Amino acid sequence: MEDSRETSPSSNNSSEELSSALQLSKGMSIFLDILRRADKNDDGKLSFEEFKAYFADGVLSGEELHELFHTIDTHNTNNLDTEELCEYFSQHLGEYENVLAALEDLNLSILKAMGKTKKDYQEASNLEQFVTRFLLKETLNQLQSLQNSLECAMETTEEQTRQERQGPSKPEVLSIQWPGKRSSRRVQRHNSFSPNSPQFNVSSPALLEEDNQWMTQINRLQKLIDRLEKKDLKLEPLEEEVIEENTKPHIMLVQRQMSVTEEDLEEFQLALKHYVESASAQSGCLRISIQKLSNESRYMIYEFWENSSVWNRHLQTNYSKTFQRSNVDFLETPELTSTMLVPASWWILKNN
């Protein structure tokens, strides 16, 4: 489908020139779109980090992704261009060669029909306008039905692959070190979305006090990381915490940092709202807190999960994958994700 992300005339021209130069066969223009969407710094090629951010599917390990990257990189430049992507995937398309060709025709047909609708709808009769609306709705229904079938097939194949693997390696989850400046990590609480925020109404206002307690714990973690970065770190005696045998010792804290493009801010907020609502309803999700940094389109999402297994299962859900795919278009740079195990005793349930 046609991507809504705007491009400059120069980038459009370069894409047309590249397409002409490569003489792409029918259906292969999708790889021009893949390159444009995954190429976050707009240099016309994909680094390994950009490749990993776009192609990681939660099944291949980091090592396997690295091997695939260098297999595709036949020019040995440590970057991928459209020619290399087309050359590799064209050898493995099978029946999907016809699918991609049909999608290319469908994309052009839909754009042509919508252009005609935009031009003629206002002057059409009531009956003609009704027919246009009906056809748009039914076209959308057909496309959504196809999308549902594809999502089921995708989920089934991924699950089958995981089950068939002997001693499966750990799926790739982006884990990038914290930025160097401590100030960029500091929580600015006055800009956080509180549980009763009209923009992110994902929690009951009754949990506001609990939210404040959790922000205290988050600040405590960030101060600890700040101290660890200092060169004059002095080790101090620790207070030992005695854990009962049947007590779960740790929970998982996930920090996700997302820099959103200004033009996609509203769409991102809607996608984030749907994601938080779905994730919060999952068993094993203890808490999700969202903050927007001052004067920036940068979001910090803190997710608390019962353990790493629950978190990894969450990554394979449809709602999580949908959010990850949408972020390819909405984010200026690939998402930064860090995980940390924290004492489970910090989690205080109010309803105990």
Swiss-Prot record:
GO molecular function, a single term: identical protein binding
Principal subcellular localization: cytoplasm
InterPro entries to which the protein is assigned, alphabetical: ABM_dom, Dimeric_a/b-barrel, EF-hand-dom_pair, EF_Hand_1_Ca_BS, EF_hand_dom, NECAB1/2/3
Any Pfam family hit: ABM
ABM domain: residues covered: 252-340
Region feature (Disordered): 155-202
Keyword Transmembrane helix (UniProt): no
Source organism superkingdom: Eukaryota
Coiled-coil region list: 135-163, 209-275
Record carries keyword Coiled coil: yes
Listed Polar residues bias regions: 190-202
Amino-acid positions noted as binding Ca(2+) in the UniProt annotation, renumbered to this chain: 39, 41, 43, 45, 50
Annotated Gene3D superfamilies: 3.30.70.100, EF-hand
Keywords per UniProt: Calcium, Coiled coil, Cytoplasm, Metal-binding, Phosphoprotein, Repeat
Localization: Cytoplasm
Modification type Phosphoserine: residues: 4, 192, 197
GO cellular component, one term: cytoplasm
Domain EF-hand intervals: 26-61, 60-95
One GO BP annotation of this record: regulation of amyloid precursor protein biosynthetic process
Subunit comment: Interacts with STX1. May interact with CPNE6.
Protein name, as recorded: N-terminal EF-hand calcium-binding protein 1
